[in-house]
């Protein structure tokens, strides 16, 4: 299966992505991570209004294979969470970069937040290196 990595996103080593629209960051999980997890059975996300700190776990995802913590690529305040994905986490694989987003965050310090994220091509190169 050919996985997509949209160029308008930034990625973390831990496979979360971020799409910025002004000071609003949409955060989700890459198609690679979703494929590796397999059948997703549970998704735990923060409440609206919760403050997130970059690098600190904000939730968890559980599949029949594994359970993994989720990490925000940016710090800020949760302004929305995807209730549909919480109720139907198995649908994350259908559209991870569209309807399968996880949370939306108002970024607290936009200038410094994306320094350690990867472009789509850098992320793909890292994944291909992991196969060796």
Curated annotation (Swiss-Prot):
One of its GO terms (biological process) is glycine decarboxylation via glycine cleavage system. The modification N6-lipoyllysine is found at residue 65. CDD domains: GCS_H (cd06848). Residues 24-106 form the Lipoyl-binding domain. Its cofactor is (R)-lipoate. It holds the Pfam family GCV_H. Binds 1 lipoyl cofactor covalently. Signal peptide: none annotated. GO terms for cellular component: cytosol; glycine cleavage complex. The keyword Zinc does not apply. Keywords: Lipoyl. PANTHER family: GLYCINE CLEAVAGE SYSTEM H PROTEIN, GLYCINE CLEAVAGE SYSTEM H PROTEIN-RELATED. Belongs to the GcvH family. The glycine cleavage system catalyzes the degradation of glycine. The H protein shuttles the methylamine group of glycine from the P protein to the T protein. The glycine cleavage system is composed of four proteins: P, T, L and H. This is Glycine cleavage system H protein. The gene is gcvH.
């Amino acid at each position: 299966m050919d996985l997509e990595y949209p160029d308008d996103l930034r990625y973390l080593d831990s496979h979360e992505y971020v799409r910025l629209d002004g000071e609003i960051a949409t955060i989700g999980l890459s198609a690679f991570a979703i494929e590796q997890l397999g059948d997703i059975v549970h998704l735990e996300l923060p409440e609206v209004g919760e403050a997130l700190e970059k690098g600190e776990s904000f939730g968890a995802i559980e599949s029949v294979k594994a359970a993994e913590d989720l990490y925000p690529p940016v710090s800020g305040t949760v302004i929305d969470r995807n209730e549909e994905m919480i109720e139907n986490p198995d649908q994350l694989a259908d559209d991870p970069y569209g309807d399968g987003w996880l949370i939306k965050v108002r970024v607290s310090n936009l200038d410094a937040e994306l320094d350690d994220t990867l472009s789509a091509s850098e992320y793909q190169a890292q994944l291909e290196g992991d196969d060796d």
